[in-house]
Amino acid sequence: MVASCKDQKKAVAICLQRSPCVMIERHNPQECLDNPELNKDLPELCIAQMKAFLDCKRGIVDMTKRFTGNAPLSTGKYDQQYENLCKGKFDPREEMEKLKLLNSQQKD
């Protein structure tokens, strides 16, 4: 994976880990994305981040962006959060509150 899309990829992974589909219903993130029944209940924030990630990936092969560049290189902004979620070092209630807060900010 090109370095310019790593932050978007981790943002999607974190959002999916915080989603009710994973936290409450105990599905894995891939099932939440692939299954249309589960997919319709994903938070808008996760869907928006997924679209940004896919646009970034599309930009990698887009010849018009070869000269202007796709996006800035990865900043490592989500590395620690991603690491904690992967290793299970988190409080599920706190993560659900973060998702609700982020989702409510996006609707405003």
From Swiss-Prot:
Give the record's keywords alphabetically. Disulfide bond, Mitochondrion
The entry assigns this protein to a family as follows: Belongs to the PET191 family.
Q: Which InterPro entries match?
A: Cyt_c_oxidase_assmbl_Pet191
**Function according to Swiss-Prot or TrEMBL:** Involved in the assembly of cytochrome c oxidase.
Q: What is recorded about the protein's domains?
A: The twin Cx9C motifs are involved in the recognition by the mitochondrial MIA40-ERV1 disulfide relay system and the subsequent transfer of disulfide bonds by dithiol/disulfide exchange reactions to the newly imported protein.
The listed location of motif Cx10C motif is: 21-32
* Motif interval(s): Cx9C motif: 46-56
What's this protein's name?
Mitochondrial protein PET191
Where does the UniProt annotation locate this protein? Mitochondrion intermembrane space
Query: What cystine pairs are annotated?
Result: C21-C56, C32-C46
- Give Gene Ontology CC terms: mitochondrial inner membrane; mitochondrial intermembrane space; mitochondrion
Q: Which domain of life is it from?
A: Eukaryota
What are the CHCH domain coordinates in residue numbering?
Answer: 18-64
